[in-house]
């Protein structure tokens, strides 16, 4: 008798779990149910001026996560991400390491590898030629994965006019 009671309890628990699974409201993955309510696609342009290699690596982990996130990828249209480099950030995407300490080189290499992977992932990458001039960076030293634009602010404005959200990375 006790054996049938245990089997009945297990069956009841399985049935309850099944029923709860069907009747429970869906939970948005990642907890973005408010932020992404009604959103069909994530479009973001990152306005990048941060010049610290270590800080930039930490930030770019999060930037990469924006378009790799399962919830974002689950929207009806794939994410579109652009990054516009200007200010001190232009030094991070250059093969010229002058002005950096040797202990920064590994962080710069890591950052540049992240940029290469982002390009392969379809991220649009642009550098402001005006910023290169102001920062004294030779345009020929910029990673080949990055497109040159005359004025990065015009690019940011253009992306915003196309519906991209602007995210400043000071």
What are these regions (language model features)?
Residues 1-7:
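N-terminal secretory signal peptides that target proteins for export/translocation
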Residues 11-22:
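Bacterial N-terminal signal peptides
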């Amino acid at each position: 008798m006790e054996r049938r009671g245990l089997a009945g309890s297990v069956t009841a628990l399985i049935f309850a779990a099944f029923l709860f699974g069907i009747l429970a409201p869906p939970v948005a993955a990642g907890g973005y149910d408010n932020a992404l309510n009604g959103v069909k696609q994530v479009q973001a342009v990152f306005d990048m001026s941060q010049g610290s290699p270590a800080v930039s690596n930490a930030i770019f982990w999060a930037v990469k996560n924006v378009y790799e996130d399962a919830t974002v990828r689950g929207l009806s249209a794939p994410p579109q991400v652009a990054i516009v480099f200007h200010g001190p950030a232009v030094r991070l995407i250059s093969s010229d390491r002058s002005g950096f300490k040797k202990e920064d080189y590994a962080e710069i290499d890591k950052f540049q590898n992240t940029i290469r992977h982002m390009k392969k992932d379809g991220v649009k990458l642009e550098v402001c030629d005006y910023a290169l001039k102001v920062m004294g960076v030779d345009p020929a030293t910029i990673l080949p994965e990055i497109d040159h634009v005359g004025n990065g602010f015009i690019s940011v404005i253009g992306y915003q006019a196309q519906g991209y959200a602007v995210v400043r990375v000071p």
